[in-house]
């Protein structure tokens, strides 16, 4: 399957994302996504556009005050607030271009505090041409990218034994969901799981009970991936067991950007620890599944 293109635009004025033309072309006609690129959430201004039309800004104190926009203190600022979160509903904003609210936001981004960022952009609309976004931002040197796909196989991989009805595991019968989660992290990191005496990097080994798989396949897809594409992949994995297979289960793990200003839904993304936010599907050959969701230590729990 194809994962579709995404785009990189260098030095794009933030004002371009609130114009009536952009909102009508992309936000109202499909799912539009944008995320500032190469910005650190703990020290830089960061921006994300969500598919529901919400524009989320994480701004340092000086920038926030210069824009004059209304927001709220970051919940991770500590005693002295040095970061603010601004949420702008583009759907509501574009409903009346003559309103004081639209004029104020437009003035803030265009004249009072013009902000420019390097953006990752993606747009999903059934039947739409992929070149629409390329032509729209042609004046900014837009680049089209495809997600990078890497395939690898591991022979004789020791894997945890799982049973769909035993989420918490059972001694000598099945491993727990938590044990699987740790094991997946080691596999994705290409860690040596043999726990040999000479291995000083990691003493981790596969949880018990386990079984040896003659050949395990790992496919890694890296890029600005849309949820719509991930759903298609998940459906294909579910159909993997339409015919009998030797494999008892397969997994699909999705990791978000560490420096995104939002994590689950519209929750603010914490930046004081690792910045993790990810989810993992485990699909069993009997069509049962597990869904695991994780965030950093300081973030709100997923819904």
Curated annotation (Swiss-Prot):
Domain of life the protein comes from: Eukaryota
Record-level Gene Ontology MF annotations: ribonuclease P activity; ribonuclease P RNA binding
GO biological process: endonucleolytic cleavage in ITS1 to separate SSU-rRNA from 5.8S rRNA and LSU-rRNA from tricistronic rRNA transcript (SSU-rRNA, 5.8S rRNA, LSU-rRNA); tRNA 5'-leader removal
Subcellular location: Nucleus, Nucleolus
InterPro entries: RNase_P_Rpp40
GO cellular component terms attached to this protein's record: multimeric ribonuclease P complex; nucleolus; ribonuclease MRP complex
Annotated Pfam families: Ribonuc_P_40
Major subcellular location class: nucleus
Keywords for the protein's UniProt record, in alphabetical order: Nucleus, rRNA processing, tRNA processing
Subunit (UniProt): Component of nuclear RNase P and RNase MRP ribonucleoproteins. RNase P consists of a catalytic RNA moiety and about 10 protein subunits; POP1, POP4, POP5, POP7, RPP14, RPP21, RPP25, RPP30, RPP38 and RPP40. Within the RNase P complex, POP1, POP7 and RPP25 form the 'finger' subcomplex, POP5, RPP14, RPP40 and homodimeric RPP30 form the 'palm' subcomplex, and RPP21, POP4 and RPP38 form the 'wrist' subcomplex. All subunits of the RNase P complex interact with the catalytic RNA. Several subunits of RNase P are also part of the RNase MRP complex.
Function: Component of ribonuclease P, a ribonucleoprotein complex that generates mature tRNA molecules by cleaving their 5'-ends. Also a component of the MRP ribonuclease complex, which cleaves pre-rRNA sequences.
Protein name per UniProt: Ribonuclease P protein subunit p40
Organism: Bos taurus (Bovine)
Lineage per the UniProt record: Eukaryota, Metazoa, Chordata, Craniata, Vertebrata
């Amino acid at each position: 399957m194809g994962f579709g293109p995404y785009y990189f635009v260098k030095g794009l004025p933030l004002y371009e994302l609130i114009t009536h033309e952009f909102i009508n072309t992309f936000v109202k006609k499909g799912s539009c996504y944008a995320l500032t690129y190469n910005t650190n959430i703990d020290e830089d201004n960061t921006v994300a556009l969500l598919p529901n039309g919400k524009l989320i800004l994480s701004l340092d104190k000086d920038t926030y005050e210069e824009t004059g926009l209304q927001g709220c203190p970051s919940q991770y600022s500590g005693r002295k607030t040095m970061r603010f979160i601004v949420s702008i509903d583009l759907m509501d904003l574009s409903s009346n271009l003559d309103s004081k609210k639209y004029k104020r936001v437009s003035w803030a981004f265009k004249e009072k505090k013009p902000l420019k960022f390097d953006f990752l952009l993606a747009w999903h609309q059934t039947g739409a041409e992929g070149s629409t976004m390329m032509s729209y931002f042609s004046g900014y040197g837009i680049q089209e990218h495809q997600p990078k796909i890497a395939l690898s196989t591991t022979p004789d991989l020791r894997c945890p034994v799982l049973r769909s009805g035993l989420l918490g595991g059972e001694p000598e019968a099945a491993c727990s969901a938590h044990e699987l989660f740790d094991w997946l992290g080691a596999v994705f990191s290409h860690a040596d799981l043999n726990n040999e005496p000479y291995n000083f990097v990691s003493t981790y080994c596969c949880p018990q009970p386990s079984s040896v798989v003659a050949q395990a396949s790992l496919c890694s897809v890296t890029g600005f991936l849309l949820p719509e594409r991930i759903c298609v992949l998940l459906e294909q994995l579910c159909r993997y067991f339409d015919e009998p297979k030797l494999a008892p289960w397969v997994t699909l793990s999705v990791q978000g950007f560490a420096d995104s200003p939002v994590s689950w839904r519209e929750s603010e993304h914490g930046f004081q620890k690792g910045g993790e936010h990810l989810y993992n599907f485990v699909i069993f050959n009997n069509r049962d599944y597990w869904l695991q969701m994780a965030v950093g230590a300081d973030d709100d729990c997923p819904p």
